[in-house]
Amino acid sequence: MEINLTSKLRFVFQSDADRKSAYDTLIAYRDACNYVSQYVFYNDFVLRQSELQSALYHELRKRFGLKSQMTQSVFKTVIARYKTVQTQLRKQRVWDGYKKDNHGKDVPNYIHKDLTFLWKPIEFKRPQLDLVRNLITASKIMCYL
């Protein structure tokens, strides 16, 4: 059985410098998500973490100054968002002209949407930070709560 623990936290900072540092981290994470989203959109919707990691990992670390876990979390966040949109699009049908049935009559042809129907990359607008921990760490955290 898989257990997921989701927490919303409210931080109270001791100084404005701490607040600015945390906000800068949130902005860097959001910008990295937008960067990876553009890469996915313009490179035939690559949704495999290993391919994204080999293409963008070092560049993300250098350009946005993210730590290793945050960089991996960027990939997971972008892939999850694109897969969610892909699932939502599959439910919609689009009329695609007519085709002939077995008796030679014209019948409407419908196709299901996929990610190629997107006009622009998915954009991350709000400052955010999603850290996904492994199951062992999560279970240790749950034991101490």
Language-model segments: residues:
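Nucleic-acid substrate recognition interfaces
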Residues: 1-145
